[in-house]
């Protein structure tokens, strides 16, 4: 979580929303998850300590307003691409793929290696359905 906050802090420092000066579907999709972390004492403490721009974004999203345009990808990529690569490419997609394979195989539980550590859990149907929609 601290790593995600750090990457998001680097991206939101100096911009109002994920893609520039107006909220996007991405902001609304991510906001709910981060808001819930902010109001929980443990992840909220990490967020307040390491992510003042992220906290400001969460608060801004309570009453979002467009104040300008979306930025070009060239301006966004240096800080947004590392966040997306790390959180989605390195962690979420490998987990999601292992989950889907476990469901197809009828497995009670499955293991997936993430960041050199083994994660074990029961497969969940909703995430497999979501993966199928984007795959």
What are these regions (language model features)?
Residues 1-59, 63-67, 72-135:
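GST-like fold's C-terminal all-alpha helical module
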């Amino acid at each position: 979580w601290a790593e995600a906050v750090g990457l998001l802090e680097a991206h939101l420092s100096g911009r109002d929303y994920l893609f520039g000066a107006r909220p996007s579907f991405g902001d609304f999709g991510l906001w709910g998850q981060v808001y819930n972390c902010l109001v929980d004492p443990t992840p909220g403490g990490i967020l307040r300590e390491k992510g003042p721009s992220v906290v400001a974004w969460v608060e801004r999203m309570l009453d979002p307003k467009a104040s300008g345009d979306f930025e070009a990808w060239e301006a966004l990529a240096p800080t947004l691409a590392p966040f997306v690569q790390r959180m989605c490419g390195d962690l979420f997609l490998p987990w999601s793929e292992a989950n889907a394979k476990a469901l197809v195989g009828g497995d009670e539980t499955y293991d997936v290696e993430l960041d050199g550590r083994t994660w074990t859990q029961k497969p969940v149907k909703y995430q497999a359905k979501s993966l199928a929609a984007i795959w």
